């Protein structure tokens, strides 16, 4: 039986193939000084509902400090065109427990629990539902 971490990593690679995104090029872009400069300027929204920790899925992740109910707003992923910790450190999984929702007539985006999230669980979204638009990524990679 495949564990959740391996399943999330396998699904990530499958998704890159589906969207025709070159993983080497993507990693080069993500590791560039320009990206790290931008990524380093992440707005801490002061939300005490989660903690930033090392993730078995990828790098850093956000872990719940208190039980979160289905459809509860966890916080902003994007606020005034600035990414927050939720926008930067929420990892991908096909077995997701949260969603990003755009706020109508705004550039803001919130993170909402898709199902009940227990203390200690990592906040996960399915990137297929949100961020990957192959036209954008294929033309904007270094």
Where are these regions (language model features)?
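Conserved catalytic SET/PR domain of SAM-dependent protein methyltransferases, capturing the structural core
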Residues: 1-142
């Amino acid at each position: 039986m495949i564990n959740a971490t391996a399943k999330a990593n396998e699904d990530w690679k499958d998704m890159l193939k589906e969207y025709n995104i070159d993983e080497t090029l993507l990693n080069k872009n993500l590791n560039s000084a320009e990206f790290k400069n931008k990524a380093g300027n992440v707005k801490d929204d002061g939300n005490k509902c989660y903690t930033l920790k090392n993730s078995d899925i990828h790098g850093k992740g956000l872990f719940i400090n208190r039980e979160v109910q289905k459809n509860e707003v966890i916080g902003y992923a994007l606020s005034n065109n600035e990414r927050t910790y939720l926008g930067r450190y929420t990892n991908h999984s096909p077995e997701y427990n949260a969603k990003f929702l755009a706020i109508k007539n705004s550039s803001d985006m919130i993170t909402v629990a898709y199902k009940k999230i227990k203390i200690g669980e990592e906040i996960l979204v399915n990137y297929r539902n949100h961020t990957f638009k192959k036209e954008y990524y294929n033309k904007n990679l270094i």
